[in-house]
Amino acid sequence: MFCYMKIKDIVNRDLVNLTNCESEPIHIPGSIQPNGFLLGLDAGTYTITYCSQNTTDFIRLSPEVMLGKSLADIFDQEQYDHFVSYADVADIDPARPFVFILDDIPYNTTVHTSGATLVLEFEPFPDGAIGLPDLYAQTRNFVSLMEKHSHLLDLCKDIAGEMRKITGYDRVMIYKFDADYNGEVIAESKRDDLNSFAGQKYPHTDIPAQARQLYVRNQLRVIADVDYIPVPLLTRGDENTDNRSLDLSLSVLRSVSPIHLQYLRNMGVCATLTISLLQKNTLWGLITCHHYTPKILPHYTRLSALLQGHFLTSQIAVREVAEEFEVGQDVEKALSNSLSLLHQNENFIEDMWDEPSLLKIANATGFVIYYKGKIYQSGNVPEQEDLLPLLKTLSEKYPSEGLHTDRLLDVYENGEKVAKYAAGIVYHSITAGTSDGILWLRKERRETINWAGNPHKAVLVNEAGETRLSPRKSFELWMEEVKNKSVAWRKVELHAAASFAYALQKHINLRYVRNQEQRSRILNEELKAANKEL
């Protein structure tokens, strides 16, 4: 007797119709890219519960035939047994895919778990050949680059070139994110006929928060053709089937946000590869590859590219610490010299306030000590009539915790005159309950930021007054001049400034105690003299 099985797709219609990329549920599209096919298995029974609609583009079995069957019913016993052995581990290594042979064609099969589902993604090898990269040569090249460069930016430039050699993309860029997730292209390798994007910034709205979270979870994403037609995922639609959406966060073939695809089309890009650069499980930056025609990248080439990303990730913290250490050596030397003078001189504030090492403690352009109603200053500082209100405000707002900022006007509204000399400050109180304080100042550094398009036009407001993010249409260079901002303070500079401020507090307290003791001795001697006279 013929039994009709009801089948339904799990395409996320909200995703397809969405106009606001900030709200996109991009991890559950319910569809994949068409350069492979997908099976979802019950992890306990290996029953096929999900199947992409395009299986007959690759093999002779349709979704109607496979859904509800065991994997053992579909593949020969030897391959099934090998796969069970491969998948029966606590953590499946995605870098070590399984190779299925179907109709005499080898398929690279990446496997991962998604809840209670085992997700298998099948991709035919290019030209039917399993081409393995020369990972030894690539590793050797990276080690050579690592030894060649001491600074991170120089290393990134060569890594971009190496990545382009490995993958064959038209353009490779390395982005670094700032604290607000605006991305800057810090290194680039490209075809000679292409315009350079090096030094350009892209607003944080280009990569919404949920996309950044996916980049942390899945460190590689590939798009073979931005004009692809999404392939729906199918599942059984009878009453006894749990038809929840399938989380494809870790998928290679996962269908991409239609808004992101339009964004790429607006750039003229046809295919991409993106690799995450993480530091302490936070997105530090991206390696982004662009191609201007469709491009399918084989798994093992993707693996090589990902390996380069891991290499670079391993060096980011090392190089940043090394560069910080270079600055730190000079700062520590200045701090040591200042502390030595402080301990040797009872009247340090009055006698040594213009010592050059005090500026060098924080690489400042101006330095101020305000003590007992008097200002001691060196370097470039504001007029005293402008400085006194600032010191009063700081002592009231930050009596104990201190303050550092590279944009004074954000914390001091009436500081236009001061900002000319002190766009950035580090402040510490030195005497409790008074306006006494110590201040390092940094002058303004005007900067022109080259945005790839107007960053403010990435956010649109509709007729209902709702804020929406949409794919930008223009990437024409848009220059923004940044004023009233200093170079950011480094951690080592802030630590040195705090250490000296603490030492100065102790010095003042100790001097107060000594003065009190001296006054007591004088008073006692005067009393003794008076008693003798009596």
Show which residues each predicted segment covers.
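Amphipathic alpha-helical "output/dimerization" segments
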Residues: 138, 297-317, 489-503, 522
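A generic structural motif
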Residues: 291-297
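Short, well-ordered loop/turn and helix-capping segments at boundaries between secondary-structure elements
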Residues: 311-314, 318, 364, 396, ...
